[in-house]
Amino acid sequence: MRKLAIIGASGHGRVVADIARKNGYSEIVFLDDDENIHECGGYPVIGKSAEAGMIDADVIVGIGNASVRRRIQESIPDEKLIILIHPDAVVAEDIVIGTGTVVMAGTVINPGARIGKGCIINTCSCVDHDCEVGDYVHIAVGSHLCGTVSVGNGTWIGAGATVSNNVSICSNCMIGAGSVVVKDVPDNVTAFGSPAKVIK
């Protein structure tokens, strides 16, 4: 029997649970630090996030916030963490994906791509050939990285955004939904628009 503990009893966590079920996990439980939450999507909440290392189960962090996801994931032994890929994702054979990353339905990841740990590659997004995606990145619903794009750690690419070929987006950035990024973006900024411009 394959058992999975998902940290984060939320809407995102329910999506992760659905992917886990499709990957053959027959027992799914949640961990959450909110003592008022007792179930999520019909699955029981059995404890808090700090208990993840002690549970006899595989573990994945199902939390959208990158800084929280990173803090929790880095407290869990690597050997307990898994990668989840929806069976309807199209994933090239030679890609590299780090532990704790979730790849959702309809996603395309093309040859030569490298994706770090703890990432969310969300529904119907595209990571094209030879892209380098850092740790704890969120590629949101329907966003597209064209070929040879680089995305730094902790960056959030908003829903429906497009990043043009050979562009580098540095760490801890936020790219607004629907933006078109055609130039490099420095660390720790928010960029928005078509073409995207740094707004703070």
Question: Model regions: which residues?
Answer:
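Phosphate-bearing ligand-interacting subdomains
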Residues: 36-91
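Short amphipathic alpha-helical segments
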Residues: 17-20, 71-75, 115, 186-187
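Structural signal for interior beta-strand "rungs" in well-ordered beta-sheet cores
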Residues: 84-192, 196-199
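Short alpha-helical
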Residues: 11, 67-68, 198
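Short helix-capping segments at alpha-helix termini
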Residues: 23-25, 77-79, 183
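Generic structural signal for conserved hydrophobic packing positions in ordered secondary structure
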Residues: 8, 59, 81, 128-129
